[in-house]
Amino acid sequence: MDAKQKIEILSTITLTEEQLNRIQSLDDRIKVEVHKNKEPNKIPDEVWRKTEILLTSGPNLPAVEKVPNLRWIQSSWTGVDKMLDDPLLQQKNVQITNSSGANVSQMGEYVIMTLLMLGHKMPQMIQAQREKRWIEDRISSLQPKELRGSTVGIVGYGSIGREVARQLFAYGATVLASKREVMHPKDTGYTPESLGDPNGNYFHRLYPIEALKGMLEECDFVVLTLPHTKSTECLFDKEMFDNMKPGSYFVNVSRGQLVDDGALIDALNSGRLAGAALDVFTEEPLPSESPLWSQPNLIITPHISAFSPNMLDQVIDLFIENLKRYLLDRPLYNVVNVELGY
C-alpha cells in the first residue's frame, strides 16, 4: 500500500462526529465521506470512482464499472445473504466483511431472555393476566423447565452461538453445539473482549451438521443461529422437528428461511414443542394473516434481537479493528466466503 496515497472511505451510514473522528484519526491518509442516501445511483459517480472502502448497511451495491478502486466492503450487518448475488462480489479484488461478533452481547441476552420466558411459562401467565384470570392449577400447570441441569443445543456455533454458550455457562446448563467444521473449534472471527467463546471452552460436546438430528434428541432447548444459505434453507422441516425431544423449546434468531413455518406450527400444536420464540421470519413484516400470530405458546418479536443503543458504536469498533489490519496488509476479520454464503 502506498504510504502517501489517500485512502478514500465512503459511508452510507450516518456517523456521529466522534465516530468519524475515531476512524480518521487512525491514519493521515484516511478520508471519510458520508452519504446518507443508500441508493447507489443517487451518489455522485465521482465519489464512487475514488472509493476504496465502503461502509454500508446495504443491500444495494454500485455497478462494477462505477467503482474501479473499490477493494473492501464492510457491512454493518451479520447476515449479508441479500448481497451475495451482486456482480460486484464476484470480483476477485473486492472482499466483503460482515459484522459478526459486533452485536453478540445483546443477542445473547435476547436468547437467554426467551429461554427463561419459555421455560418459566411466561406466555401463559401473561395471557392469564390479560384475561384477569388467576391460574388455579398453577402448581401443576406452571412447573418451570430450569436452565440449570437442562441441555441446550446451539445449531450454528459462530459468534452469536458462542456468546449464548458463554452466558448459559453461568446458569449451569449443558451446552451441545453443532458447526460445519468440528475439527476447528476455535473462533478466528472478530470477538469483543470478554465476550463469546473464542477458544471453544463453553460447549460440552460439538457435533458436525450431519449429526444434528442425534444432537436434537438430547436437547431441552434448541437455539438456531446459522446463516441463511442454500444448504440451510428450510433446515428445520417436519423431519427435523420430529427428531426434537418431546416437550422441548425452540428459538430462532438466524433467518426465517431456515424454518418451515407449517412444520413448526404442527410441532407446537402436537406438543412435540412446548413453546418457541421467533425473532425472524420468511416474510418481514410478518403478515397479519399469518397463523403464527395465533399460536398461544409462541413468542413473536419484530427482528429486534440485534438492536441496541450501542449497536452502531459496536459496528464501528469492529470496522476500526479491521481498518487497522487493512492498513497493515493483514487479513481482515469476518471475510465472507461468497460461495458458502457466510
Features from the language model and the residues they span:
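Short, well-ordered coil/turn residues at beta-beta hairpins
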Residues: 12, 57, 76, 225-228, ...
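Phosphate/diphosphate ligand-binding glycine-rich loop within oxidoreductases
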Residues: 49-130, 144-145
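Phosphate-coordination loops involved in phosphoryl transfer and adenosine-cofactor binding
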Residues: 4-6, 148-151, 247
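Conserved beta-strand positions in the Rossmann-like core of class I SAM-dependent methyltransferases
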Residues: 176
